[in-house]
Amino acid sequence: MSLSIIQKMNEMLLTEMPEYRAQAAEVGVSGEQQRRLLRALMNLRTPRPLSEDFLALQDELLSAEREARGVVDVMALPSVASDARIALWQGDITRLAADAIVNAANAALLGCFIPCHRCIDNAIHSAAGLQLREACAALMEVQGHPEETGTAQITEGYNLPARHVIHTVGPIVSGALTDRHRAQLASCYRSCLSLAAERGLRSIAFCCISTGEFHFPRAAAAEIAVREVRDFLTRDTSIERVVFNVFKDEDRNIYERLLS
């Protein structure tokens, strides 16, 4: 998409959010700089009705970026040796074509408002488009209270290759790891799997819930994830593919050991 179109989208958002105009004026005019500004403004935008003109431009841009990143079909990924229904994949979760990908959300469930933050919540919302925040806001308005730790909600995937996003809030570990933290993380995996099965979904891809901004120890989190998935798959035959999606080499090594 041309630089002029991205600049037009930025102007549309700045018209809604004039409080950011002075900061935006300091951003360079290269395509990369203006695209980063667009992501920042989208991250900052609070839930409110979206214009059809903006949505058309946004969807065209995000669709083109999705194809440029490359779409990965989770059903075509090689299975781990220990279970034909489980796969391990290292990379960007927003590339995965699955019935659902799992987002490690916060209790507000509205996505990350920190401009261009490097968390999974920000990455998923930025790739899906502003419709995802609108959908989450609608869920939260009906619910009337923050999302509890260990539960799950589902939305459409919008501009993601995944059909749906399952949002779950993992435990925050600020000191020593406790049995309560472990139980809450286990509940996240069970809730996501149960919701996927209830909706008739055949494939689901998990990020490493709580191991980033929420500081759950990586090895302990992976042990819980693998245990809960294996236990669920012994009782449920409807889900045909579960992917453990990792981003860091450290996580890949941990999962390779657990799944061997």
Predicted regions and their residues:
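Macrodomain-like recognition of ADP-ribose-binding/processing modules
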Residues: 1-260
